[in-house]
Amino acid sequence: MRKTITARLIWLPLCAMAQQWKANGMSAEEVTPKGWQYSVAEGDLNKDGVSDIVVLATPNHAENLKTRDDGYVYNFNTPELAIYLGQKGGGYNCWKTYDNVVPPRPDEYNSIDATISITPRGVLSISLEHFSSAGGWGNTTETFLYRYQGKDFFLIGEDEETMARNTGEAEKISRNYLTNRCQRIKYNVFNDKVKPKETWSKMKKEPLKKLGE
């Protein structure tokens, strides 16, 4: 079954949240709330010739932390995404911050590994790898591609790749919202003798969704 992500846009003055993101700064470390674990992607998102940064950070609010008997700490806080546009004179200004674009870890047995990157063409890629340590053999990775156009970021494509860890059977579904075409490939990770099966289909044309919708 295809997973969906419900995203809610948080856009407050100067990127303010319960614990504030800084309105501007010279680096990802400087703008990210202190103590939050974060990753950063760098590239030119708005095609102005100046490098921008996207920061994905997980809060450390104590009420959403749980310590295991062996000392390992589960973090159930919801990650936050912040986009900072580079300035020609140096540094970055906060453009928008988003809450719930990336879902939190659901429980002790299921995790979501989120990664962000910016392609050479300035497309923001958000990948979510769902992993279950108990109760199932399936792995799912979702990748969402957003492009800056018309003064906002719009979803232009997404991939969904599933794999059974016990059999190696896998399927990848790629949706292109610019061409309205869908590619589906079935293959086997463990057996090269199994020939991949590829099919294409048309999708209904719909308005592009904004990041955060």
What are these regions (language model features)?
Residues 113-213:
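Acidic, small-residue rich beta-repeat scaffolds with periodic aromatic anchors
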Residues 27-53:
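N-terminal targeting signals for Sec/Tat export/insertion, comprising classic cleavable signal peptides
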Residues 19-33, 88-108:
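Blade-edge motifs of beta-propeller repeat domains
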Residues 38, 79-81, 141:
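Repetitive beta-architecture junctions, highlighting loop-to-beta-strand starts
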Residues 1-21:
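Bacterial Sec-dependent N-terminal signal peptides
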Residues 36-40, 110-116:
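Signature of short aromatic-glycine-proline-rich micro-motifs recurring in repeat-based ectodomains
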Residues 62-98, 146-148:
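Beta-propeller blade repeat segments, especially FG-GAP/WD-type strand-to-loop junctions
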Residues 45-57, 119-128:
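Acidic/hydrophobic-patterned starts of short beta strands in beta-sheet-rich repeat architectures
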